[in-house]
């Protein structure tokens, strides 16, 4: 995961918060934009504001913006954005543990979540933007 502080005049949409509440993915729910290099208007990228501390040990903090690529598959060991029960968004590691898939936090105060039919991948976390 890279922290991206580069300035750019190219923008991607910020679609809401993730990790501690509902996640709205529709285009009409854009709450802002963020400059992001090497992208265009037809990009598969969007940003979500982090709420909560379940990924703190990976360096993902409250109010960080995570950049999501909705067309990049999430593989074992990747950090991804997921929709749970069609209402709650979260970012976690996707990990195979003893033949089963889990969403795994980077904070020992949270439990792993077994992947089932109620969990849908949104996209892979490809970058992070932090306001210093």
Cite the ranges covered by each PLM segment:
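Short, positionally conserved secondary-structure boundary motifs
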Residues: 1-61, 89, 96-101, 122, ...
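C-terminal regulatory/effector modules of DNA-binding transcriptional regulators
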Residues: 61-132
């Amino acid at each position: 995961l890279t922290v991206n502080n580069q300035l750019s005049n190219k923008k991607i949409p910020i679609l809401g918060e993730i990790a501690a509440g509902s996640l709205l993915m529709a285009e009409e729910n854009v709450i802002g934009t963020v400059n992001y290099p090497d992208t265009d208007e037809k990009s598969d990228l969007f940003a979500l504001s982090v709420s909560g501390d379940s990924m703190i040990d990976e360096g993902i903090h409250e109010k960080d913006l995570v950049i999501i690529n909705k067309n990049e598959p999430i593989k074992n060991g990747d950090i991804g954005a997921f929709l749970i029960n069609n209402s709650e968004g979260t970012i976690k590691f996707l990990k195979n543990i003893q033949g089963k898939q889990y969403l795994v936090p980077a904070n020992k105060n949270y439990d792993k979540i077994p992947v089932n039919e109620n969990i849908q991948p949104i996209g892979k976390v490809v970058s992070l933007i932090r306001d210093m």
